[in-house]
Amino acid sequence: MTALTQMKCEACQADAPKVTDEELAELIRMIPDWGVQVRDGIMQLERVYKFKNFKLAMAFTNKLAELAEEEFHHPGILTEWGKVTVTWWSHSIKGLHKNDFIMAAKTDLLLD
């Protein structure tokens, strides 16, 4: 499979299929620092990034905002002192789409 970071998000309509259990098992191995959470019955990807201070956390948040705009796919972001919690899911299908895994992998690249 092509590296997730090399892929582009595709338009996700309300009738787009959610990832299957088999796809989930394969894709989650490609982003090992991410976990799967279920909130209000909606499966989501989540990761907490740690930083030395609020300024670094905010700089990461701003880079993530730019990436989200470029890909037209937007996460939940909670920025706090020393950490940023990022949550990816596809709002239109109320669950996980391949786009969410692509964006999780690209989010990890922002640390470099």
From Swiss-Prot:
The keyword Ribonucleoprotein does not apply. Keywords: Lyase. It catalyses: (4aS,6R)-4a-hydroxy-L-erythro-5,6,7,8-tetrahydrobiopterin = (6R)-L-erythro-6,7-dihydrobiopterin + H2O. One of its GO terms (biological process) is tetrahydrobiopterin biosynthetic process. One of its GO terms (molecular function) is 4-alpha-hydroxytetrahydrobiopterin dehydratase activity. It comes from the Bacteria. InterPro entries: PCD_sf, Pterin-4-alpha-carb_dehyd, Pterin_deHydtase. Pfam families: Pterin_4a (PF01329). Its EC number is 4.2.1.96. SUPFAM superfamilies: PCD-like (SSF55248). The keyword Lyase applies. Belongs to the pterin-4-alpha-carbinolamine dehydratase family. NCBIfam families: PRK00823.1-1. This is Putative pterin-4-alpha-carbinolamine dehydratase. It comes from Shewanella oneidensis (strain ATCC 700550 / JCM 31522 / CIP 106686 / LMG 19005 / NCIMB 14063 / MR-1). The lineage of its organism: Bacteria, Pseudomonadati, Pseudomonadota, Gammaproteobacteria, Alteromonadales.
